[in-house]
From Swiss-Prot:
The Cytochrome b5 heme-binding domain, residue ranges: 1-82
Gene3D superfamilies linked: Cytochrome b5-like heme/steroid binding domain
Gene name, Swiss-Prot/TrEMBL: sdeA
Native source species: Emericella nidulans (strain FGSC A4 / ATCC 38163 / CBS 112.46 / NRRL 194 / M139)
PANTHER family for the chain: DELTA 8-(E)-SPHINGOLIPID DESATURASE, FATTY ACID DESATURASE 2
Lineage: Eukaryota, Fungi, Dikarya, Ascomycota, Pezizomycotina
Protein name, entry field: Delta 8-(E)-sphingolipid desaturase
Amino acid sequence: MASHTKDALLSRRYIEGQIAAGKHIIIFDDRVLKVDSWIKFHPGGDKSIKHMVGQDATDEINALHSVEARQRMLAFQIGRIQGPWVNFLPPIQGGKFRHYDENADSEEDDTSGQSQPPSPIFDAVDAAPGVRRQYASSETSVSTPASESSEPKPFFLDARTREEIVLDTAKYPSLDAKTQQDIKRRYRELNKRIEAEGLYDCNYFSYFIEACRYTLFAGLSYFFLRLGWYSVSAVFLGCFWHQLVFSAHDAGHIAITHNYQVDSIIGILIADFLGGLSLGWWKRSHNVHHIVTNEPEHDPDIEHMPFFAISHRFFMNLRSTYYDRVMYFDAFSNFMLKYQHYLYYPILLFGRFNLYRLSWEYLILGQGPRKGPAWWHRWFEIAGQIFFWIWFGYGVLYCSIPTWGSRLSFLFISHMVTAPVHVQITLSHFAMSTADLGVQESFPQKMLRTTMDVDCPTWLDFFHGGLQFQAIHHLYPRIPRHNLRRTQKLVLEFCRDTGIPYALFTFTDGNKEVIGRLGDIAKQVRILEECRKSCAQQGVFSNHH
């Protein structure tokens, strides 16, 4: 294994050793890619790559990248594999790997590498075949992002985790290799059918209609601003921002022109120049979300401590691999989570202000790529942020509105009107599964298990902006949103053929599901609080160190 060509067959044991040495190895279409030299150039950030180390990332790569980008990836090929690949748990998620010894017996090493990947949670023996199991060995840990809390937790938390896994494994197709391979095959066949039917082709007339709608809202906002009807003007400005987000989302997924740089420019003009939000921040976060959807330790889209928690696992002081910090379940979060089902909508009214903070943190700290094709995006975005605060902060708020009371009213009304988009974003995932079924679960099954769609009439599609088809979007992110309704019929066939449940709720029922989930977690917080009080009174943890 010391020297090999790009087409040389590499053993599982050798690949494991490379990962143990800190290399970033991923599998793509039976090719072994070593992407260490590319990771700092990756436009989507380094985290999304780190979550794919040691895994067959074929479906994730195909879903999120253009044909041209996939072709460029082949430059990092160092070999091939033969036969189906059994995924490792990535180092960033707590995976452990053994260093490679060229003098060791290769056959023995390969077979020993077939054991189940380790789990940072627990050994779910009773859940179902194929669920992650821990195995002990003399492995070297590359990265172990475990909880920093040593405080013991009540047993009901682990019992709840097991219960959720049991429920999901009973509801969804088996996690055995044959079943999951069949799901992958059908998913890839469906992609070919989608391509053949032209559903990846953008309908530019639909975007002309969108542009007319944006212009109408912006024009009405300006009209009423000049009349001095500041509150009405603020409402239409909020509608303008609400609708703009959907096209920025499309551009971020390269779903408009399918050209990376062109769509990036479109997205930055919309998000930064017109909306004051960083497209780069959103892409970095969103790409990770698309790969580790609804995983409490890894998905930034559900990491809203101390205000919201959609899983009891947030009670365990989880360490976020995205933010590289511990999400503490402290006294403040304990209080907030007990009432989160009541505070959900009020807090979302102020959601846009938090996006400003995250955007500036991303740009000031330079968290995006500084090299490669996206090196200049940061500076273009900063220019966009300056432009936004000149036209909105100075031109609208300061120069066009005479009193501070009216200015504050305009500011809050315009921002609160955008709250529905925060509801639409959280609606797709907050009520769905957060159970960890292991690294052998196929990409399409995981996306459908963790994502909800909204059933709405066609005439209301403009209001949801494609977010009503989030499950379908997660399967095929680069499909232009105006084609998602047609794609839905094909995905329904796929779900019937594979036996994967398709979660579809009306907007009202979906909101009820979300509030119900938040209320359930709030109830668990109260139970945990009672457990702690009881244990403290009985001195159960008095000898714990």
